[in-house]
């Protein structure tokens, strides 16, 4: 099993054209299980109210259970948008397998592009019935991988480890220069990522193009810093980039041991000083223009080979005036679909240290460490950390506190927004500034993951969806049309209000995160920085 398969059942090679798949192999389902019922209840093609009214049942009938067990056998439809008889007629393998047709569609048919034309035909009526599943993007996020290629050899890189030949693919420049152009007016952040943001041939040209033509947009970059040379530094300085560098260690030796492929440690030891030098050069430019509030975020992936480097890494990050300090746990050493760390001897003490630092530094600089954390780990450790007197923690981390003197999360955030306002850029809330890709939107009486409503994630081969941690179900190639002059264009409203997007919204509104990465903090429908608010950062929202 490939590494990312542990997180979700990702299919890398979605066909650009819609094809009929071979018959599904499945066994008859003699008993109804709760999971099957959930598939029906949370289907955009099921309407319990319509079902009861149409077939004369009382309002107290468990409509999903009835259709799942009995109704489909009687030829009943789950809604006006899905025909039981028609689906079985067009899919004889399903008819012969004694499986509920809507359940089959949910589990198999959707991914196999079955019943596609029929759904597209009724999609306007579906969206009319469920307006909460329709959207018009506003200050959205476009995550764009202009290349999957990278100049590093990180041993835990998902692209390197699982993308096969696609790991070197670059996106057709016409896609981000022309096809994406109509959506830019609805975008607040363009996140340039993939392989390395600064490594593609078109990286500089694209960043310059965006800065000149869409100055209201904040460009966010994810990189190791190796290719972040003078021309990129000047461009980032002038246009207030939000930069993130994965440096992963405090020294070249630890970097080579814990991050880089072990068969090329000599190269790793040469690359690390280049990364640090580029960051320092950029910091000098920022400081000269009183823009240190835009200092890069720095991150580290924690594993067995660098867990004892956390404090030294934090010290280095503070010396480099890091905007935020971000930690991830190496998913190749843990089952991130489980509730607890696979390597607790290494990961658990590391997590406790991060929680202590999070508490000590909360108002000075944010330690962001709650991403890719098995769901059962944080609670007990949090209680331990809460029970420690703050004076004891301040004494324990006296050296780190000294390095953080004068830092203030609130002041730096306000200053960034002052610069953005003067430059005509969209301003950020504090939470959005910390985690532009992981935040919540208000939905009636609660908050919920913003991504299905306001994000597009685009890969070099055209695969796309609303989040890089959601199984891609669309392909840009299927949305390319031609105008009267033969010029290609994309109607982005059709993308954003496609059945796939609407379907995901409907499920997520019902706390059904099927297809999402199992350990995403959004699955709990809580802010990824909620824990920090315990330490008085909540007042920063005012």
Language model features with spans:
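Hydrophobic/aromatic residues in well-formed alpha-helices
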Residues: 51, 87, 176, 255, ...
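Charge-rich, low-complexity intrinsically disordered regions
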Residues: 11, 17-125
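Membrane-proximal basic amphipathic "stem/tether" segments
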Residues: 1-41, 114-133, 406, 412, ...
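Conserved alpha-helical substructure of the radical SAM core
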Residues: 119-242, 253-270, 277, 333-358, ...
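Flexible mid-to-C-terminal extensions adjoining Fe-S/redox cofactors in radical SAM and related proteins
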Residues: 122-138, 160, 164, 443-457, ...
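Processing junctions and N-termini across compartments
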Residues: 99, 144, 148-151, 443, ...
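Radical SAM enzyme [4Fe-4S]-AdoMet core and its adjacent flexible, acidic
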Residues: 145, 166-169, 238-490, 529-532
């Amino acid at each position: 099993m490939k590494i990312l398969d542990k997180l979700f059942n990702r299919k890398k090679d979605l066909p650009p054209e819609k094809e009929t798949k071979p018959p599904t192999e499945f066994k008859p389902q003699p008993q109804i299980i709760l999971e099957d019922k959930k598939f029906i209840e949370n289907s955009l093609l099921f309407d319990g109210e319509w079902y009861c009214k149409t077939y004369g049942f009382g309002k107290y009938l468990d409509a999903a259970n009835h259709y799942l067990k009995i109704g489909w056998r009687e030829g009943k439809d789950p809604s006006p948008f899905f025909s039981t008889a028609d689906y079985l007629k067009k899919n004889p393998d399903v008819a012969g397998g004694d499986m509920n047709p809507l359940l089959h569609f949910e589990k198999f048919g959707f991914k196999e592009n079955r019943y596609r034309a029929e759904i597209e035909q009724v999609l306007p009526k579906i969206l009319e019935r469920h307006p909460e599943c329709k959207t018009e993007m506003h200050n959205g996020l476009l995550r764009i991988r202009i290349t999957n290629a990278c100049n590093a050899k990180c041993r835990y890189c998902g692209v390197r480890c699982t993308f096969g030949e696609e790991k070197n693919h670059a996106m057709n420049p016409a896609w981000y220069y022309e096809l994406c152009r109509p959506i830019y007016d609805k975008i607040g952040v363009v996140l340039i990522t993939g392989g390395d943001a600064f490594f593609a041939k078109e990286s500089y040209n694209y960043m310059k193009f965006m800065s000149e033509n869409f100055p209201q947009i904040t460009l966010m970059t994810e990189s190791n810093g190796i290719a972040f040379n003078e021309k990129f530094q000047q461009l980032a300085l002038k246009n207030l980039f939000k930069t993130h560098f994965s440096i992963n260690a405090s020294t070249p030796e630890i970097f080579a041991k814990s991050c880089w492929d072990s068969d090329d440690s000599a190269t790793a030891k040469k690359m690390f000083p280049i990364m640090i030098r580029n960051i320092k050069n950029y910091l000098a430019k920022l400081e000269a223009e009183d823009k240190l509030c835009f200092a890069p975020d720095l991150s580290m992936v924690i594993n067995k080979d660098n867990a004892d480097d956390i404090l030294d890494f934090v010290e280095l990050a503070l010396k480099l005036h890091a905007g935020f300090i971000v930690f991830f746990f190496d998913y190749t050493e843990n089952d991130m679909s489980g509730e607890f760390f696979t390597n607790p001897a290494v990961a658990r003490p590391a997590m406790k240290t991060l929680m202590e630092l999070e508490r000590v530094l909360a108002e000075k600089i944010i330690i962001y460490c709650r991403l890719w954390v098995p769901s059962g780990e944080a609670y007990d450790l949090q209680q331990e950390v809460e029970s420690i007197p703050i004076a004891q923690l301040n004494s324990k981390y006296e050296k780190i506190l000294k390095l953080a003197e004068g830092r203030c999360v609130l002041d730096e955030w306000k200053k960034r927004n002052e610069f953005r306002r003067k430059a005509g850029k969209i301003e950020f809330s504090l939470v959005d500034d910390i985690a532009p890709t992981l935040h919540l939107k208000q939905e009636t009486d609660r908050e919920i993951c913003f991504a299905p409503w306001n994000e597009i994630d685009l890969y070099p081969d055209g695969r796309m969806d609303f989040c890089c941690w959601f199984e891609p179900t669309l392909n840009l190639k299927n949305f390319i049309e031609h105008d009267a002059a033969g010029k290609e264009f994309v109607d982005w409203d059709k993308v954003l209000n496609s059945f796939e997007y609407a379907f995901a919204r409907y499920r997520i509104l019902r706390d059904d995160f099927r297809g999402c990465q199992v350990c995403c903090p959004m699955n709990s429908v809580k802010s990824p920085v909620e824990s920090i608010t315990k330490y008085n950062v909540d007042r920063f929202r005012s």
